[in-house]
């Protein structure tokens, strides 16, 4: 409470889960009518030995609209997520060099806005995630240890975004996109062949983020 709201003790603050699809998982507030003063927290539970957890996902069309993705970049991503008549996808490292360059230029130019969209929420959203709480699950009894300070790490989202943007976007050897430090973009897959398997999925590496920010 002291870190998020700048106050000692709980005072009149309460916590609730947003009744919408906004980015925060938990809202802290002392005045239920003052929405703009609410502090949003995004929470990620992770196993240190597991590299990535989902940060955001949606259809290509949704991201084209929300992120202003250009036509050329959108077509490269379309070939990346949707199989052709032969059942094949074009991994990003298999796309023509000119298309790879266009895609990388776009994500480099708008890296911070995109990372913020993924982690903090839509630019026009009223409720945003102001903080990121990472909770380590080291054994089967992790739920009982949620309140143990040893296992959770709280960081201002602005610092998390800075951390991710400390590394430039690049295409991996596997043909996915590294959007920044600890963040990747890939095809969701799975879902029994449903259309949602073609969604774009942003994944975050909580371990890397924690290791970098804990040094600061």
State where each predicted segment sits.
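Short, positively charged
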Residues: 1-24, 28-216
């Amino acid at each position: 409470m002291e870190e998020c709201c700048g106050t000692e003790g709980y005072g009149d603050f309460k916590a609730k889960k947003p009744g919408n699809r906004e980015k925060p998982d938990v809202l802290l507030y002392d005045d239920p009518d003052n929405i703009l003063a609410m502090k949003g927290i995004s929470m990620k539970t992770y196993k240190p030995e597991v590299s990535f957890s989902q940060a955001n996902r949606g259809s290509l069309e949704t991201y084209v609209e929300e992120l202003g993705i250009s036509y050329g970049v959108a077509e490269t991503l379309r070939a990346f997520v949707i199989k052709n008549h032969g059942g094949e996808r074009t991994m990003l490292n298999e796309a023509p060099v000119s298309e790879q360059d266009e895609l990388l230029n776009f994500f480099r130019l708008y890296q911070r806005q995109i990372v913020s969209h993924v982690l903090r929420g839509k630019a026009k959203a009223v409720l945003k995630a102001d903080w990121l709480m990472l909770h380590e699950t080291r054994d089967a009894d992790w739920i009982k240890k949620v309140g143990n300070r040893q296992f959770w790490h709280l960081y201002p989202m602005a610092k998390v975004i800075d951390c991710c943007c400390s590394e430039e976007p690049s295409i991996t050897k596997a043909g996915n996109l590294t959007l920044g430090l600890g963040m990747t973009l890939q095809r969701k897959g799975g879902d029994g062949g449903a259309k949602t398997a073609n969604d774009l999925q942003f994944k975050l590496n909580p371990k890397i983020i924690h290791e970098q920010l804990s040094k600061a």
